[in-house]
């Protein structure tokens, strides 16, 4: 799995990733949905790992939208959606698999994986350029070829919420009444 699946998504990713990097962001995923009036979905993270906000999404939208207009990548009318990767984010890069080791994920393969299966659920163990590793619920460890991953996404758990809050520096901070 990569940040882009189709040739069009790969072209868009290649165009916008350098500009996002200059702005301090990393591209997590590009998806193009629909045909008549496609929607280009851009998912991004801050390069430093901190959370992105609405203003960041707006800045990314303006920069990416202008570039896509100039390059005329999509000849028809299209929409643009920009978002953060979120807590239950997709795992599209090796660094995502490494960063979220110890958390639960669901994976769908585009090719049969170990045991002929296409769907897996388990604890992320990490990854390298060739394979992502999971410990399944029964304790079996599997190695899934990166180029065979169709979808991989973290599962929302209390542990993931706590880890994300801690990374954002908001863990254990008491709520103040307004």
UniProtKB/Swiss-Prot annotation:
Pfam hit, one: DUF150_C
GO biological process: ribosomal small subunit assembly; translation
InterPro entries the record matches: Ribosome_maturation_RimP, RimP_C, RimP_C_sf, RimP_N, RimP_N_sf
Entry GO CC: cytosol
Top-rank lineage group of the source organism: Bacteria
Keywords: Cytoplasm, Ribosome biogenesis
CDD domains cross-referenced by the UniProt entry: YlxS_C
Protein localization: Cytoplasm
Described function: Required for maturation of 30S ribosomal subunits.
Family label: Belongs to the RimP family.
The protein's name in its UniProt record: Ribosome maturation factor RimP
Organism the protein comes from: Granulibacter bethesdensis (strain ATCC BAA-1260 / CGDNIH1)
């Amino acid at each position: 799995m990569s940040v882009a699946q189709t040739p069009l998504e790969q072209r868009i990713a290649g165009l916008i990733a350098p500009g996002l990097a200059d702005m301090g962001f990393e591209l997590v995923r590009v998806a193009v949905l629909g045909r008549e009036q496609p929607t280009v979905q851009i998912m991004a993270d801050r390069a430093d790992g901190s959370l992105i906000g609405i203003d960041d999404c707006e800045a990314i939208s303006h920069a990416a939208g202008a570039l896509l207009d100039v390059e005329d990548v999509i000849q028809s009318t299209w929409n643009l959606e920009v978002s953060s990767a979120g807590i239950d984010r997709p795992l599209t890069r090796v660094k995502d698999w490494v960063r979220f080791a110890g958390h639960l994920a669901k994976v769908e393969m585009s090719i049969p994986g170990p045991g002929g299966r296409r769907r897996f659920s388990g604890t992320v163990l990490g990854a390298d350029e060739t394979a992502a590793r999971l410990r399944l619920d029964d304790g079996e460890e599997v190695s899934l070829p990166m180029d065979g991953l169709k979808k991989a996404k973290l599962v929302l758990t209390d542990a993931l919420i706590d880890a994300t809050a801690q990374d954002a520096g908001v863990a254990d901070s008491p709520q103040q009444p307004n």
